[in-house]
């Protein structure tokens, strides 16, 4: 139905010319507007997505969803997808028309459902190197803020990462489908599942970019982690720092050094865990590549 197809398996060799991303994604967009009314009628009570957690949550979206997003107020600076306010988004697609300037890089992102302008400010040498390594024709993951300017929509990127494993493309589009289904699910179905204690078995843990419980709570359902220095327990410790209300209320997020000091763990170890959790959609970069927040906004 959603037709997300990826040619080839791994590898990162692409030609920079000819064609567009439709040949890769196979028409992988979908039509969220068909069920929007159901989501917009969801308010209050259990289930659904409370207004207070909407705007800052990182949502995986397609370009078509961005272009179809409704504007939520008179100054036309806020957007909503399926009734949920959106400010921070994740997109996956092909970089086109890259233009390097002294302070920033602009390009067009094509994901097969449409095209959107993207701007990435280069605040330091790390940002410059990140963008220098990516060229026209590369497929990228973009995390950034959705903005409106002169009647047009664009993304101001916080991070741009070149894709080397094409499972990331499939994962992103499946994630988009799942988010769409969750946002448009009738309230009665949400409440019925809550009342009967029926778990939502369609959502794997790695695909949740919102409304997640801390991972330590999930792990305790099965068994408590037995090791104290590596593996799941260390990941939980790092994520729990980002789930701290004081950290979640900080718009800029926190850096690797902060987490390292708080947990008394090596910065290199913490940094690797954070990068892995960014790739899984649990964390995202904010003002630069050194500050991160949880995608759970609760």
Curated annotation (Swiss-Prot):
It comes from Oryza sativa subsp. japonica (Rice). Belongs to the replication factor A protein 2 family. Component of the replication protein A complex (RPA) required for DNA recombination, repair and replication. The activity of RPA is mediated by single-stranded DNA binding and protein interactions. Keywords: DNA damage, DNA recombination, DNA repair, DNA replication, DNA-binding, Nucleus. GO terms for biological process: DNA replication; double-strand break repair via homologous recombination; nucleotide-excision repair. Phosphorylated in a cell-cycle-dependent manner (from the S phase until mitosis). In response to DNA damage, recruited to DNA-repair nuclear foci, as a hypophosphorylated form. It holds the Pfam family tRNA_anti-codon. Heterotrimer of RPA1, RPA2 and RPA3 (canonical replication protein A complex). Interacts with RPA1A and RPA3. InterPro entries: NA-bd_OB-fold, NA-bd_OB_tRNA, RFA2-like, Rfa2/RPA32, RPA_C, WH-like_DNA-bd_sf, WH_DNA-bd_sf. One of its GO terms (molecular function) is telomeric DNA binding. The gene is RPA2B. The lineage of its organism: Eukaryota, Viridiplantae, Streptophyta, Embryophyta, Tracheophyta. It comes from the Eukaryota. CDD domains: RPA2_DBD_D. This is Replication protein A 32 kDa subunit B.
